[in-house]
Amino acid sequence: MKGDGIPDYQTCTRYVYVPGHFKKVIYRLHRFTQDGKVFEPKTPPAVFMNSSYTSSFVAGLLQLRYMYAMPAERIIHYFEDQGFNLKKPTAGFLLGRAAETLENFYKAIRKAVLSDDYIASDETYFKILVPEKNSKGKGVKKGYFWVIVGRESGLLYAVCRDGSRAGDVIYDELHDYHGTMHSDAASFYRKIQCDDFPNITRIACLQHIKRKFIDCMDTEPEAKEMVKLINKLYHENHKHKIGENSWTVEDNFKWRQQYAPAILAEIKDKLNEILKKPDLLPDSELSDAASYFNNEWEAVVDIFKRGDTALDNNLVERMNRYFSMSRRSSLFFGSHKGAERAAVLYTLALSAKMNHLNLFDYLADILDRTAKWQPNTPLEKYRNLLPDRWQPSTED
């Protein structure tokens, strides 16, 4: 520092990229003999039996595959560029064993999600290689993941059953469920409103409804008015956020009781006006939007009977983008078994994402912690290691 108070140095910043690197650690394990008996040394722990790969390697592989949507072949080339030769069968082995090892975490997440009082569901498609040829002569079939999110726990559960989109898949998951479920108006979801599911209240997605009016509002003034009315609900809903400034679920419910009835009545009047228009063409976009909204009306009103419900199902749709990223990158799964394995790993990856965890850190930690747990370990023991409760290990 100079006498005039001016520093005699200045600082500047340069950012350096250091590519990922791999370590090959060789242990020298000593045998010893006592009283004529040879004692073999214990080998360092490995995440999988008969494998030389550590939890960090497996966690890195899973992060690239299921968070960054890199297909296995691309990961192999990426590793090659960094000086490591990973064979494709080895990559497949590690991914498969990871799914098997994390199976109990998957089951524990399912149990936690379906214990949540408020869930949301959607489905998304993928392509799968099958022996049978389709009409175009290709052995490719469209399959589906069903996604259920626990809105209170922030955990995500993905299920794939032979790629089926039949309602039985979701019905089997929900047959004992008690609570509120958010979804769009696909027929298999609307069936949940019937007497077969007396303990479930299905609520609608206002964004799905609004999009239908947006699609025709350039040519239909009534559609533009309806969009403005729906936006009034969003405007009032955004004035407060649960957890901020001591705002509680009960506060939010009371606030909804104040603003929602008048706006909903205004919307219902406009909806009836559209439906009764003498010149409304049955096959028009406006007619389709109004009919869709009218069929969902009860499920819309039910949104405002709780203080903690969202106005739409956008959270699940955002999570589904990770499936679509993989779909665009990988093109297909090699088999139904591969898709079911992916459901396990996506469940862990996206649950970690929803809880703002670094997937690499999370997976490396839980793989190490549970390496010696038996397959029949009670699911309750996994509960505090799920992403919504996990705390990093304090062990060295």
What are these regions (language model features)?
Residues 1-51:
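Basic, low-complexity segments
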